[in-house]
Amino acid sequence: MNATTSAAAYGPLAGADLEAELAQARVTDDAVRDAAIVDRDGGASVVPLARRRPGSPAPGDAVTLSGVSKRFGTRTVLDNVELGIARGSFVAIVGRSGCGKSTLLRLVAGLETPSSGALATRGEGGGTLDTRIMYQDARLLPWKTVLQNVMLGLGRGARDRARAVLDEVGLLERANDWPAQLSGGQRQRVALARALVHRPQLLLLDEPLGALDALTRIEMHALIERLWREHRFTALLVTHDVQEAVALGDRILLIEQGRVALDQQVPLDRPRARASAAFAALEDRVLQRVLAGGPGGADQEAAREVDHVRPVGQIRWAV
């Protein structure tokens, strides 16, 4: 895929354009409301969510970047990036604010196109790589219940799948509640369920836990790791938290001044023992490398605010 390829070629991403998504939701409100009736006494049965594929992930790279650069006006945010993301791996991306890590995630998602170079995504069997993205803001529709939010964009037949994935994230009993009734961590669990109900091959995580307290973050780490191990999707996490990167990643990438400055494997057993000397040593090694890079200048990614205004109708609503 070259720099001129349409973002649509990346395949489905957590629903269609925002306007189309909201229009679809209004059309199907009655059907979804009927489907969202859940027995509060817990008597309703739950059909386990089918695993997308059993066993080990298929070999090869799910995402490949070859000489990819991204510029906003005169600012170069990513500079000649060469990178392959192995299918079924969990890759964490760290770096200072403005280094280009979120821009990299948006390129992989198809929300931006490269200024130069080639970016290829490949699903199993050579098909489309089904991709979902999760942000720090859960982006739940406040006028829909938890179950309706998970079912957004899906038909009545998805009710059992939605209930099953809510059960997996520990929120089946909150299916009839409104988003305003949930804590921040619970809202992020709903956002995660809404991504997983589509059984994605690639899950992109753009600092999804940044606004949560420390204990809730640790709980979410365990949940994300468990679901990743069960479903074997490819995961790409952007985070400022080096400890989070070591806790979740098989591999840690440091983006510095638009380039991959460090590519560190994480040779630690799962689940990660955070109190172990090996964990602390690896965390310190990566953190010291991040600090050694210096502040690196102004926040280049903020250039999107000035130089790259995207029409509302083109904005994709992720997750």
Swiss-Prot record:
It catalyses: ATP + H2O + aliphatic sulfonate-[sulfonate-binding protein]Side 1 = ADP + phosphate + aliphatic sulfonateSide 2 + [sulfonate-binding protein]Side 1. It is found in: Cell inner membrane. The keyword Translocase applies. Its main location: membrane. GO terms for cellular component: plasma membrane. It is a peripheral membrane protein. Pfam families: ABC_tran (PF00005). SMART domains: AAA (SM00382). Its EC number is 7.6.2.14. GO terms for molecular function: ATP binding; ATP hydrolysis activity. It comes from the Bacteria. SUPFAM superfamilies: P-loop containing nucleoside triphosphate hydrolases. Residues 63-282 form the ABC transporter domain. Keywords: ATP-binding, Cell inner membrane, Cell membrane, Membrane, Nucleotide-binding, Translocase, Transport. ATP binds at residues 95-102. Belongs to the ABC transporter superfamily. Aliphatic sulfonates importer (TC 3.A.1.17.2) family. Part of the ABC transporter complex SsuABC involved in aliphatic sulfonates import. Responsible for energy coupling to the transport system. The complex is composed of two ATP-binding proteins (SsuB), two transmembrane proteins (SsuC) and a solute-binding protein (SsuA). This is Aliphatic sulfonates import ATP-binding protein SsuB. The lineage of its organism: Bacteria, Pseudomonadati, Pseudomonadota, Betaproteobacteria, Burkholderiales.
